[in-house]
């Protein structure tokens, strides 16, 4: 599983300059787990149809930027005259873009908040449609030289949050408070995270902090790659980002739900069975009126994403593919 990772990636680009953007990246991520990531053998190949033309705009999640780029490239091999423009400033930018008609696709690394759904429904009198497109294990990264072998969710919460809603008995500021006894244990913990526009920020706040408050010491980064890059350059650093951003200079820390429970790797199997605490779906939101099919170009783009070729690109980008039975259910939403 290889992909080029784009550091300091601009928020908006068109496919006409993708090759140049890919050349800008320098890190080559490794496999996200010891096991090989498996495609469901029941996935179907994409079948090209006639009449597909025009353009698609996508505004939303930074986490999905690279994957959308790969999907767009693959789709344009089928339909060379199609243009796809992608802007990734964070999941919170997707709902207003859909409401205002600025984009046909709203990629998000979390589900929409009730307030976002309500705003959409006030304008259109129906709800937005959520399309799961991949599985991500939101990973906790440390520097490759950090010897920590695992963290409980309570410890993770006590590192990142001043609220400590998982019930840990003390604020964790030093690595020795996680069980490290060597010289490394006396090091203060440097904390890296995303900004509040990010869906990853919101997902981590909800699931890792139980909606507690982040510590003021968290160094907010503009993108997923920036978090991992910062941790790779800081021996005492810790941060969270999508599993597709793993590089050779960081490690992913296994997590346990509680003290004494087994640590779970951020693997495909543990994400599929729900035992990894921070697994999530990644979504595309679309504006689909009831009893009315999506525009042909949008419908076919989603069908390509759901094809064997599209889910193979999910694996290429470091995320986990969907099962064929889920895809069959979701495809029925498109008509």
PLM feature segments, named:
Residues 32-335:
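Flexible loop/hinge segments at secondary-structure junctions
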Residues 4, 25-26, 58:
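Intrinsically disordered/low-complexity terminal segments and short unstructured peptides
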Residues 14-27:
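Bacterial N-terminal signal peptides
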